[in-house]
Amino acid sequence: MPMFVDPKPPSQYLYFNFHPLRNASMSQELELKLLIAPEKRDQALKVCQSLADARSGTTQKTQFELRNSYFDTSDLRLRQFDMGLRIRSHKDQKEQTIKLAGRVMGGMHQRPEYNVNVDSEKPDLTLFDSEIWPDDFPVYDIQRDLETIFVTDFTRTRWRLPSGDGVIEMVLDEGQIQAGENSETISEIELELQGGSIDDAYHLAHQLVSKVEAKVGSLSKAARGYMLAGKSLLEPFTQMHYVPLEGDFTIGQALYRAVEYGLRHWQHNESCLLFNPSVRAVQGLADGIQLVRVALEQLIELGVGERQLLTNLAKITEQLQWLKNFEGLDELTAEDGAYHRALKRYEKLYESLQNSQEDVIRLNEVAEVVASARYQTTVLKLSQFLIEQEMTEELSQPVSPWCSQLLKSDWQLVQTAFSEHEKLNEEGYLKLLKPLQNSLLMGTCFGELFDDDVREKFRLPWQDLARGIREITALHILHERIKERDDDDLDRLLEWQKMQRESLLKALEYSRKAALKRDPYWFA
C-alpha cells in the first residue's frame, strides 16, 4: 500500500474551514482549531452559547449535518502536491473544494481554497480554473485515478459572532472520521475569521482553553483521515534543519520565519507525542521550543514580543529536564555507541543501566504539561504573535549585515570562554555547554544565508565538541552506577571508567583547539 511520509508537519497540508455552501471561486481560510474531550461536549455547548450571548446578546445557534468525502489517487499524488480535495454534502447541496498549500501556526490555519457547487458524488478537477494548478500538475491523469480515501460525518453547531468589520464563525463539530473499518472521533471547536478581529478570535480561544480545557489543534480532520486510512505516517522530526531564509529578507522576516519554523517543528512533534508517545517526539518538541526561544529573544531585544513568553518557555523546558539523564543513559547503552561493547560484558551493570533508562522516562508527565493551561496559552500567544508580525523601523532593515554582526558578537563570547584557560576540566566544559548550544542554535536560525561548505567547515568541530561535552554527563552517570555496585568487578570498572573520562577529556581538548582555529563563516 502506498504510504506518504510528510517531509514537514502534516498539519501544513490539509485543513478545512466551515463556511456555508456557496457559489464562489477562491477564498483565503483563516481559522483557529481547538480540540475538546468528547465528555465535555455539553459543557462546551453551554460555554459557546455563553460566549456568543456575551458578544451579541441575540446570537442564535444553527445545527446541521455534514458529510465530507475526501479524494486522492492510490499513490497520493494530490497529497504530494500539498493539496486536499473533498466533496461536502449538506441536505441536497454538494460543494467541491480543492485546498492548496498553506500554513499552520499554533492552531491558526491559513490556506487558499477553491469551491464550486456540483451535482455529482465524484469530483471533477476540470471545473476549477486551470490557472490554479502548478505548471507540472497532471490534471487529467489525476482526475482519471481519483478514489475515495475516507469520509467524515459530523454534526455542526454554529454561532455567528459580530466582530470588527465582519464576523467570527464559531462552530462545534461532533462526529466520526471513517476509513474502511477504522473510525476516529471528531470533537473540536473552530473559530473562523470572516472579516472579524484577530484579537477577538484569540480572546475567545483563551476563554475556551480556560473554561472547557480546549487544546490547540494543529492536525486537521483530513490529516487525521489520511493516517486513519493508513495512507500517511506521523513520524517525529529528530533533526533540526536550517531555517529557510532568503538573502533579501529583512531582520523581521528572518526572525519571524525562525519562530514559525521552530513552532512547526515543536507542534509536529507534539502531535507525534499525543498519537504515539515516544522519547523521540519529546526530544523533537524540546528542540523546537529551544529554536523558538533563541529567535524570540532577539525579537524582544529589538522591541517586539512579551518577555513573559520567554518565562513560559523556560518553565515548560524545566519539566523536560529528565531528557538529559535519558540521553546520558542512552549514550551508554545504545548498540552503536562507544561504550556498548565494553559494558555488555558486565551483564548486571548493563541491565541496571537499561532499567534506569526506562525509569527516567516521563511521557505521562509530558502529556500533562502539554494539556496544561499554561502550555496551551503559550502556544496561542505565539500563534497570535506570528499572525500579527509587528514591524518596526529596525526590523525593516536587511538581515544579512545585522545577523553577521550578531553572530560575530555572540561567538566572541563563546570563543573567549573556550580560550581563556589553557586546559579545561570536566566541570569547566559542562559550564560552557549551554552558551555553546545557544550559539549553535543561532547558527541554525541564520546559517541558510551563508555558503554551505564554509559554514559546515566551521560548525562541525563545535558540534563535535558539544556532543563530547554531553558525553561527560553519561560518564558521570556511569560512575555513580558503578559505585552502587558491591562485587568483585568494582575496582576494575572504576579504573575502566576513569580511563574513559581521561580519554574523553583528551578528545575534547583536541576538538576545542581545532575549533578555535576555524575561520567564522559569516565573514567569508
Label each region the model flagged.
Residues M1-A24:
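N-terminal amphipathic/basic-hydrophobic helices that include classical n-h-c signal peptides
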